């Protein structure tokens, strides 16, 4: 489930969004 959300976030958000999410996790 988390993996799917991460994938969607990567497509929706940008590299910056992923970096921020990664820190949150």
From Swiss-Prot:
Please tell me whether the keyword Plastid is annotated for this protein: yes
Cellular component, GO annotation: chloroplast
Q: Using the UniProt record, give the first listed, main subcellular location.
A: plastid
Sorted keywords for this record are: Chloroplast, Plastid
Q: Where in the cell is it found?
A: Plastid, Chloroplast
Q: What is this protein called?
A: Uncharacterized 3.1 kDa protein in psbJ-trnE intergenic region
- Please name the source species: Trieres chinensis
Instruction: Read off the lineage from the record.
Output: Eukaryota, Sar, Stramenopiles, Ochrophyta, Bacillariophyta
